[in-house]
Amino acid sequence: MTRVAVVAGGGEHTGPAVALRLAAGGFDVALLGSEFTSADKTVRRVEEYGRQCVTVRAELSDARSVAVAFGRVRTALSGPAVLVTCVGPQPLPDGLPEDESADEQRYTAVRRALRPVFVCCQAGAGQLLRHRWGRIIIVTEPADADGNTWRTSRPVLDGLIGFTRSAALELARSGTTVNLVAPADRAADSRAPAHRAAGDDSAGSYADGVAHVTEFLVDERAVGITGQAIRVAARADVPLLRER
């Protein structure tokens, strides 16, 4: 297999944390996304591990844009063996009424959250099939405590669980595993932010937990783990891993 990993999305916390952990494990890394607010720092730190790191702009919900991005990754590094795609629940307009129009907006928000996973996995699977070995890891971010993304977090998570299981079955014969990493805290249980602890700043700790799990899933020891939803704590008062 090649030692190249693609990390799509992930913002300022999860994506960089995963990229650095993969680099420490001997992977060259390509960062895919539409914005790179902290990319320079991530690139420098990856290079400190003696690995290469490139940033490739792509609209992750657009199949053509992602296909072009993967082509650039192949040119700059090589065909990837690992794909990590990070997504999060989408916000809804404040004061949304309970009617058919509101339902359609909720469906749209859920589709908007799920679309990048489908697009990136479709593009990445084609690359992994060539190697007859691969790891696909889908990461969903915790709901924002200051917004209303908790309202879409449960349907997004349910959709990702179903997709993960289906993709794992489809790709099993090719030596590719597919797993989901999701928050273990109450943000994933479709509860309002009022139920969460005050002053909760969990982005960094969750990112570290995701990076830790990713490191294990890309290892040969995890060859038999596929189609699973692994829950990671997003707060210090929740155990790091919780069995689903």
Curated annotation (Swiss-Prot):
Stretches that traverse the bilayer: none
Keyword Cell inner membrane: no
GO biological process terms held by the UniProt record: novobiocin biosynthetic process
Record keywords, A-Z: Antibiotic biosynthesis, NADP
Keyword NADP in record: yes
SUPFAM superfamilies in alphabetical order: NAD(P)-binding Rossmann-fold domains
Positions with a binding annotation for NADP(+): 9-12, 59-60, 154-158
Biological pathway: Antibiotic biosynthesis; novobiocin biosynthesis
Protein family according to the UniProt entry: Belongs to the short-chain dehydrogenases/reductases (SDR) family.
Functional note: Non-catalytic subunit of the NovJ(2)K(2) heterotetramer that catalyzes the NADPH-dependent reduction of the tyrosyl moiety of L-beta-OH-Tyr-S-NovH intermediate to yield the tethered beta-ketotyrosyl-S-NovH in the novobiocin biosynthesis pathway. Novobiocin is an aminocoumarin family antibiotic that targets bacterial DNA gyrases.
Subunit structure: Heterotetramer; the NovJ(2)K(2) heterotetramer is composed of subunits of 2 NovJ and 2 subunits of NovK.
Descriptive protein name: Short-chain dehydrogenase/reductase family member NovK
Species this chain originates from: Streptomyces niveus
